[in-house]
Amino acid sequence: LDNEIKNLIIYKKALFNSDLVSENELLKILNPVINSESIWKSHALYLLAEFFYSKEEKQKAKEIFNQILVLPNANSTIKNESQKRLNRDLGE
């Protein structure tokens, strides 16, 4: 399989399991995508940031939303949603 398809499958697995797993499990699933230059990296980071936000871990969420904003190849919709979340809910 093409690398980007593999990364999409990893992202979908994380998305499907995000309500059921711990922080460590989610990180373990997403690490291959987060540590790559994949087009799915911004999506994976956004999922992780929203996971932390839902767990009331606002500082971790804020750090990850900020990482998305400086990614050179971040999806523009993901970037905009990250900026909105920072402005609206995390005081940026």
Identify what each model region corresponds to.
Residues L1-E92:
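Soluble extracytoplasmic domains of inner/organellar membrane proteins
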